[in-house]
Amino acid sequence: MQLSVWTYEGPPHIGAMRIATAMRDVHYVLHAPQGDTYADLLFTMIERRDRRPPVTYTTFQARDLGGDTADLLQSAVRAAYERFQPQAMLVGASCTAELIQDDPGGLAQALKLPIPVIPLELPAYQRKENWGASETFYRIVRALAASSADGSPRREREAGARPVCNLLGPTALGFRHRDDLAEVTRQVVELGIEINVVAPWNATPADLARLPQAGFNIVLYPEIALTAAQWLHRQFGQPFTRTIPIGVGATRDFIAEVAALAGVDASPVLARSESRLPWYSRSVDSTYLTGKRVFIFGDATHAVAAARVATQELGFEVVGLGTYAREFAREIREAAAVYGVEPLITDDYLEVEARVGELRPELVLGTQMERHIAKRLGIPCAVISAPCHVQDFPARYSPQMGFEGANVLFDTWVHPLMMGLEEHLLGMFREDHEFADHAPSHLGAASAAPAPAPLRVVETVTSTELAWASDAERELTKIPFFVRGKARRNTERFARERNVNLITLETLYDAKAHFGR
């Protein structure tokens, strides 16, 4: 067992909750002990939903283990049906309840309720949240779509009829899923394509039964919808998209792919495409962009897309690329090979922190944890992927996909670099009389502060007793903070190799010239 203060993904039943919460007229009965009800807070506190997830917990306690927990589960299922009257019910166990092996799905089906009861077998000790969401969505689609069709191939569209598609993948607690869906919907409608079903977002079981009526499927998040889309392709002959529209180039490719599947002309939509990212990235001071070293980590979909945007549209250099989702390790390895970097496939945040510390990039694109890591290391950062915190569920419209999403990416990624330069300039000129350590105030003048202590030599003692002269230390502070650590390490390495115990201003300049060759 590995103890940790952070995990990139929760257990698979959290993924099942994301699907149930995203849908309507679905209820999830979770066989779980009293302490597993914490998951509600993910949706009400972090995502700021206005209602609790549609989940009933059996909440058995330690004393119940000596009795019949199976009867407790059946009572909870029966009560949930009578109270909420859902169109379909999901039944599963939490990671803790899995240990007592009560077979929740079988027990619920034995009640013979007049609605579909979909059992979920989610191995909590082998799989995690995204897999749980994918498996849950697949099970629901398979149970409801198969019951409404005979499995025959889809019918060809009649002449003159509008093409029809499904949008698959948006869930509760997803990174900008709400706004991505709005942006992609607008683009699909502009192509003259009718949207049959959006799932699981706001879909009902009756909606899922209509999935086979579409001509093709648009997969927005492969971590969630790829398995279901593959089954729909095998069962009903529905092709599905593979391009994720994040960034200007990928959005244009996505529109072309959707148009090809629908048999429509994409050129009018592509001609009207408006995004400020291409011009902004060409017009902005190259100091902010060109050649900036960036480290990328997140779910595979957003990480691979971010690498393409960073290199092809912003002129960054990718120095690290990784994911916590082992199910999509192949995609990350293929992308890492393109950029000539070593892929990082891990769900241990300490490994990620070590890699960031080793590479010392100028920008980190990652999850909420990479935000903390970058802050500790003094590196600019932007969040591009779940897991994320409350500030990444904004009230404003802020997609990641489509042409408007490209504008959001530019602002989100470039502004930390610009602010970093601003902080550096403030640091350089902080001794100027026009700058002060404290923010200006409209209040009356404070009492005179004591005179500052005289400057003294700051000694940084290392294993080889290195010390920094005060003038060298002051000069070091003029180096931008995001490369200051690297400059310090290189200078100390230069001094050790030459048996220099006191690093002076001359030593600092010599080291800079040595490593700048």
Swiss-Prot record:
Lineage of the organism: Bacteria, Pseudomonadati, Pseudomonadota, Alphaproteobacteria, Hyphomicrobiales
Binding residues for [4Fe-4S] cluster: D36
Protein name: Light-independent protochlorophyllide reductase subunit B
EC number: 1.3.7.7
Function according to Swiss-Prot or TrEMBL: Component of the dark-operative protochlorophyllide reductase (DPOR) that uses Mg-ATP and reduced ferredoxin to reduce ring D of protochlorophyllide (Pchlide) to form chlorophyllide a (Chlide). This reaction is light-independent. The NB-protein (BchN-BchB) is the catalytic component of the complex.
Name of the gene encoding the protein in the UniProt record: bchB
Cofactor note (record): Binds 1 [4Fe-4S] cluster per heterodimer. The cluster is bound at the heterodimer interface by residues from both subunits.
Catalytic activity: chlorophyllide a + oxidized 2[4Fe-4S]-[ferredoxin] + 2 ADP + 2 phosphate = protochlorophyllide a + reduced 2[4Fe-4S]-[ferredoxin] + 2 ATP + 2 H2O
Enzyme class, broadest EC rank: oxidoreductase
Family: Belongs to the ChlB/BchB/BchZ family.
Recorded metabolic or biological pathway in which this protein acts: Porphyrin-containing compound metabolism; bacteriochlorophyll biosynthesis (light-independent)
Biological process (GO), any one: light-independent bacteriochlorophyll biosynthetic process
UniProt keyword Zinc present: no
Signal peptide annotation: none
